């Protein structure tokens, strides 16, 4: 894996990725690819990016030894990469800062975004306020109901939230609408995609901005324990927090990488969002080719997860490629396992995790007891759980 280079010049990671969009979007994506290529080679761009990550986001985010949880489970030592401590409460802002700086560089006055859990919507509204741009956020009507606190946050930050009533009224449909809007207003509008998916150059660009997670973690773990973890684990929906942790570790062959998809009610039921674990075929959605939950006629299937942010039928193309070349293992945590992990982290560490991140914690909860006390699991705690309090209370039958 020392020679891992992806994507190629056409935006493909092996057989995944690429550019599957209508003719009308090609010029916009070409303009974006050219602008990103120029920015990528400009030290001043990265200087501005690092400045905002430090002074605005509050990076570096620490790594934390979850000693009480580790002791309770008996087995491997669990460490957390604390992305929940970033400004706006999740990893999403790493990417929105980068894309907003690029939008500014390109002279765009307006940004649009899609959001599921609302975290990316909040992070996009935040950077729009920070850089003086107008912002429209597209959000499925069902997700709006699930994530009212984040909807209000976006409005407080000056964004306009557009409810999407079509299809399953979730993230997939919000992304469809945002892409339609981008086609119509490409001259003055920059589309901030929130995950490591979409047409090229988005998967590469989002990954590059999120790699700050893994780069920091490598230096921090070396300092904290004198070596790298035995396992690095992250939840995977579209997969931006996971690729940000994994990518810097791809060349470290003694570090096992584990991506945890949303198992929902079980991959043997229709109610999950686990394209890789369920053996979904390759399909095209939102401008890229990847494993995609679909029926025998190629129609995209409905998904289910207790966490709005993992409720997506596809997966970022680089994850599909890393699965194909067997560098990353993909598995699932079911709703009930994620909820149990959520409770355990609250009780033993005083940390309320996002339900998305709880899927990664669930893998650690399940596997730490099978490992030695001298082994180390690094969990990417991708976000905090304030936004999920209503969902968890409802599931427990508690009225707030």
Curated annotation (Swiss-Prot):
GO molecular function: tryptophan synthase activity
Disulfide cross-links: none
Modified residues (N6-(pyridoxal phosphate)lysine): 92
Source organism, top-level taxon: Bacteria
Keyword Kinase: no
Pathway the protein acts in: Amino-acid biosynthesis; L-tryptophan biosynthesis; L-tryptophan from chorismate: step 5/5
Listed InterPro entries: Trp_synth_b_CS, Trp_synth_beta, Trp_synth_beta/beta-like, TrpB-like_PALP, TrpB-like_PALP_sf
Obligatory cofactor(s): pyridoxal 5'-phosphate
Listed Pfam families: PALP
EC numbers on record: 4.2.1.20
Protein role: The beta subunit is responsible for the synthesis of L-tryptophan from indole and L-serine.
Assembly and interaction partners: Tetramer of two alpha and two beta chains.
Protein family per UniProt: Belongs to the TrpB family.
Listed name of the protein: Tryptophan synthase beta chain
Species whose genome carries this gene: Neisseria meningitidis serogroup B (strain ATCC BAA-335 / MC58)
Gene that specifies this protein: trpB
